[in-house]
Amino acid sequence: VYPERLRAAIDAGWHTGKELPGSAGLGHVGAMKLISDGSLNTRSAYCSTPYSGIEPLTYGTLSYTPQQIEDYMRLATEHGFDIACHAIGDEANTIALNAVAATHAHGSIEHAQMLKPVDIPRFAELGLTASIQPQHAMDDRDVITRFWANPAGIPYPFRALHDAGTTLRMGSDAPVAPLDPWLAISAAVLGTESSDREPFQPEQCLDVHTSLAASTATGRDRLASGDPADVVLLDADPYAADTPEAMRAMPQHVVMTLLCGE
């Protein structure tokens, strides 16, 4: 639910987790999706330092004022909605985190592509999930050195967030990147799309265990009794995939998909 439609959703009795009619239990109302800034490639992600090599100087664009962001988060939280706040630039993330702290909102920051070091521990402190898209780092690695040459924050700080105790969830942001979880897992673990190229920020790479867990609905990489029987079976071992080519080929090894056990 976008902010401009939030009041109508509240009036209709919607809230996060409510089952959608006709979905047979497979569809539920999600979070309030608030897009606080733009993107790196368009130089519209809102940053605390100006973009490199651009005249006139630009810091990106904030879609709402900080007060509006706080007000929408408060309204959502008071009426049973989680928040999913798109924030890419470091200053947009600071503003989003400040709003969460002020409103006690719960949910996720989407993307979190550049963070000031001081903001990294705040995710865990505030109980927020960092919803990350590692394939974007592969798409952006060359652009980062061009537009974020002197950033105040750390771009794509996957390992730093994990080490600070943040709950990570990984996705694709499709159609921006292909709807393929193995691309994200490969990027997070190996930091490159090809064995012919050095990893990007290897100090921020994650292990396979963490990446697989962040790619599941349960947040674990092991099945447990009582889990939903939504399972993909492979005839190859992702823990043994030590090259991006091997990890990115995992869709070719799917032998069975179960949804609700069927």
Segment roles from a protein language model:
Residues 1-33, 107-113, 117, 143-169:
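Phosphate/diphosphate-binding loops
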Residues 2-4, 34-39, 88-90, 114-116, ...:
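Short, glycine-/Ser/Thr-/acidic-enriched flexible segments
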Residues 91-106, 182-195, 232:
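Short, electropositive alpha-helical surface patch
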Residues 60-102, 214-238:
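Long hydrophobic segments that form regular secondary structure
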Residues 1-90, 122-129, 134-135, 185:
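Metal-coordinating catalytic core of metallo-dependent amide/deamination hydrolases
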Residues 29, 38, 86, 109, ...:
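Divalent metal-coordination and catalytic microenvironments
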Residues 114-210, 217:
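Active-site-adjacent C-terminal substructures of enzyme catalytic domains
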Residues 180, 192-217, 222-262:
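C-terminal cap of metal-dependent C-N hydrolases
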